[in-house]
């Protein structure tokens, strides 16, 4: 039987961060690596994730505990905590497939989000596309980014978004592409977006337009 080489998942763990690339088509998709897993471990993982997704949808993410997930999945607490050390780890795992969908659109989808548009236009399209993604699962992304200090920067998905933004900014000739990528992604943090949408009651479409304009400003080349 193949050895179970998977470890516990949490929002503070590194999740297959993309390697440095030189071409947009080389950007790796999160989660494409082959991971060997025992059949019983795989079944338990699927049961846990299905239970977590169901409970999060029914009660909201803050209203669900790890004990609730273990009970709903029919697994022992030890089994749950060996694989997912906290709710942040559950959030990261649940988001994986959804994030890969957006990543695939970036890699091979139609322009302006995918290849074929000018770099500045692609950057603005990424902002709009990511905001739409974020709006659909804001609580999950918020949990995955804030469950432990620095959790957001350690996820493979964040590494992918940063590499993509940095690449496009480099292509536009913008100065300090690393810093500008970080500035743009800081505005797209789930906690910040939640504040704008739920505390300040900003309209999502208006916010997308404003942040896309900010992306275009960041993409301006050296004078």
Q: What does each model-found stretch correspond to?
A:
Residues 91-98, 137, 141:
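Alpha-helical DNA-contacting segments of helix-turn-helix folds
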Residues 38, 45-46, 66, 88, ...:
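Short, structured helix-loop boundary elements
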Residues 93, 107-136:
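Hydrophobic alpha-helical connector segments
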Residues 74-84:
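Short hydrophobic/aromatic patch on the recognition helix
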């Amino acid at each position: 039987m193949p050895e179970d080489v998977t470890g516990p998942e949490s929002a503070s763990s590194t999740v297959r961060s993309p390697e440095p690339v030189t071409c947009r088509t080389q950007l790796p998709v999160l989660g494409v690596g082959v991971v060997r897993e025992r059949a019983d471990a795989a079944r338990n993982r699927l049961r846990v994730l299905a239970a977590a997704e169901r409970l999060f949808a029914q009660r909201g993410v803050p209203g669900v505990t790890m004990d609730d997930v273990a009970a709903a999945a029919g697994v022992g607490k030890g089994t749950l905590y060996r694989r997912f050390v906290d709710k942040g780890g559950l959030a990261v795992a649940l988001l994986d497939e959804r994030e890969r969908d957006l990543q695939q659109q970036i890699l091979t989808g139609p322009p302006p989000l995918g290849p074929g548009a000018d770099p500045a236009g692609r950057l603005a399209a990424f902002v709009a596309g990511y905001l739409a993604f974020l709006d659909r699962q804001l609580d999950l992304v918020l949990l995955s980014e804030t469950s432990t200090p620095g959790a957001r920067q350690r996820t493979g998905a964040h590494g992918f978004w940063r590499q993509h933004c940095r690449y496009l900014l480099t292509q536009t000739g913008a100065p300090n592409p690393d810093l500008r990528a970080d500035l743009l992604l800081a505005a797209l943090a789930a906690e910040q977006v939640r504040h704008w949408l739920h505390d300040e009651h900003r309209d999502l479409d208006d916010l997308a337009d404003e942040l896309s304009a900010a992306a275009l400003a960041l993409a301006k080349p050296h004078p």
